[in-house]
Design a protein with these regions (language model features):
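Membrane-embedded multi-pass helical conduit in multi-pass membrane proteins
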Residues: 246-326
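Acidic helix N-cap motif at the loop->helix transition within catalytic regions
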Residues: 15-16, 40-47, 91
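Short, acidic, metal-binding catalytic loop of nucleotide-sugar glycosyltransferases
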Residues: 19-28
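The conserved acidic donor/metal-binding loop of glycosyltransferases
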Residues: 83-87, 170
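N-proximal low-complexity "stem/linker" segments adjacent to membrane-targeting elements
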Residues: 1-19
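Short beta-strand/loop segment that forms part of the nucleotide-sugar
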Residues: 29-37, 54-56
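Long helical/loop segments within the catalytic core of UDP-sugar-dependent glycosyltransferases
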Residues: 55, 59-72, 76-77, 90-169, ...
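Cell-envelope/extracellular polymer assembly enzymes that use nucleotide-activated donors
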Residues: 1-2, 30, 177
Length: 337
């Protein structure tokens, strides 16, 4: 297998990513860092660790562009894409490999957890990931349709990846775009929870806002791009519909209904609606945390999750209004860390 590491000004983190790849129980044939015209010496850091470094003639403008540039060099049957701020559990690559014993499988992804859990935003994301990957992703895998093969770490069958033209930059969520395109092409995607990766998550509100803006617009753009094709894919259409509807209703409830009712009816207790589903969230979260012996960390991080969830709702509602109502699509790719 060949690993592609797209990197733009990632000198502070790319070494950890490379070392985690070099320490894998299943060593990759080649590690290729795509230095996307960085200005901080990212390429030099990578070269010092003995990996292949390629640099496009000009900045590609997106992670999708950098990954597709790296794909040109791949000569192996499998291709791994990993962010330059992400480290892997020592057996992550080995854990993903069995998924490709089935010829219909085109992609496989693993369990994602934040590398650092310190700030309120990192803590909120920690609970968000524990909940999503312990509950939603497992359910999607049961029906054979994981909603997305995570962009921070996924493995692909190279021939099929090339058939898709690599990663497209037509949306802000190239990983979601590729996953849904694979389904519509009759291919399968697998979720392997034993393959764990640890990306660096936004530590400040400014960084989180940048990431949420990109993610929210990316989801809406993909719904608009793929909605006809989604209708032909059983289970995926339901998963997307539920996710879109849930996010829309949640945005309306958190940002309008609850505060309005609390003020108009003079009933402050109505604001408890923000955490009314706490038991449903806590069960899978604590189950996932228990398996990792992180119960105390999880309990301490739960309040941050409800803060982040409300902020998520705000950015999703803004994206829906911008993309569907105002016709202001997001085209500039900005990193979120």
């Amino acid at each position: 297998m060949t690993v592609i590491v797209p990197a733009y000004n990632e000198a502070a983190s790319v070494a950890d990513t490379i070392r985690s790849l070099q320490a894998q129980t299943e060593r990759p044939f080649e590690i290729t860092v795509v230095d996307d015209c960085s200005t901080d010496g990212t390429g030099d850091v990578a070269r010092a660790l003995g990996v292949t470094v390629v640099r496009p003639p000009h900045n590609t403008g997106s992670k999708a562009g950098a990954q597709s540039f790296g794909l040109r060099r791949v000569r192996t049957l499998l291709t791994v894409a990993i962010d330059a701020d992400t480290v892997l559990a020592p057996d992550a690559l080995e854990r993903l490999l069995p998924a490709f014993e089935r010829p219909e499988v085109a992609a496989a992804c693993g369990f994602v957890l934040p590398q650092r859990v310190r700030s309120v935003w990192e803590r909120g994301r920690y609970i968000e990931y524990l909940f999503a990957f312990t509950f939603y992703k497992q359910l999607q895998e049961y029906y054979g349709k994981p909603l997305i093969s995570s962009g921070c770490f996924s493995m692909y069958r190279t021939a099929i990846l090339r058939e898709q033209g690599g990663w497209s930059d037509r949306t802000m969520a190239e990983d979601m775009d590729l996953t849904w395109s694979l389904y519509q092409g009759g291919h399968a995607v697998r979720f392997v929870p034993e393959a764990v990766c640890y990306p660096i998550e936004p530590r400040t509100f400014t960084l989180m806002a940048t990431q949420l803006r990109r993610w929210s617009h990316g989801f809406v753009q993909n719904v608009r791009l793929h909605w006809r094709g989604l209708l032909t894919v059983p289970y995926l259409r339901s998963a997307v519909a539920v996710a879109f509807w849930d996010a829309t209703i949640a945005a309306a409830v958190y940002l309008v209904v609850l505060p309005l009712l609390a003020v108009l009816l003079a009933r402050p207790w109505i604001l408890l609606g923000y955490v009314i589903d706490a038991p449903a969230v806590l069960v899978p979260v604590l189950a996932g945390a228990a398996r990792r012996r992180e119960i105390r960390r999880a309990l301490a991080s739960v309040p941050a999750f409800f803060v982040l969830r409300t902020v998520n709702a705000l950015f999703f509602l803004r994206a829906v209004c911008a993309e569907f109502v105002l016709g202001r699509s997001l085209h500039v790719y900005e990193k979120g860390h």
